[in-house]
Amino acid sequence: REDSPSGLFTRDMLTQLDAVFQRMAAPLVLKLYLDDTALSAELETYMTQLCALTEKLTLVKEESMDTEVADIQERPCVRICREDGSWTGLAFHGVPGGHEFTSFVLGLYNAAGPGQTLDEETLRRVRSLPAVKMQILVSLSCTMCPELVTAAQRIAAENPLVTAEVYDLNHFPRLRERY
């Protein structure tokens, strides 16, 4: 198999992505919330190329600049949604590249099902958690962040009261300064 035409995905990445897509139990919709920045254009290109690799992913650009939903104020953003358009609780603000690409793909797998295996006790505890909105601030060069992101997304995929929103700190200095 050749590299993707855009050069975004290597042959090895395409093989690994194909294996994940084949195991996904349900289709997903990736909703993009963009602005007029170069970063938004990069996210749109990245997600367009990713969705072109499988029929299990559909891309939707949300044109509205409505900021009723707090996280949409921080653009660009991709929300992982179910086929009916309802939000799974997983979102990435920025472009999920670098070390975060794998955790983003695992988030897709966990949201679509069957997801990474959890033992019964862990599953029971995750499902009993109260409402929590996790905001995870990462650096794409961080080697420790993907494990935290994957765990948070796994919890959010399993519990409808939990959300896991990941932010690339390089592009959201207000959050970096605040926390």
What is the role of each PLM region?
Residues 5, 21, 65, 124-126, ...:
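Feature detects long, helix-prone N-terminal segments enriched in hydrophobes
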Residues 80-115:
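Non-catalytic, surface beta->alpha helical segment in thiol-disulfide oxidoreductase systems
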Residues 78, 92-94, 148-152:
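Long, contiguous hydrophobic alpha-helical segments, chiefly transmembrane helices and signal peptides
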Residues 114-129:
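Long, charged amphipathic helices and adjacent flexible linkers at domain junctions
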Residues 7-49, 53, 127-164:
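Local sequence-structure signature of Cys/Sec-based thiol-disulfide redox active-site neighborhoods
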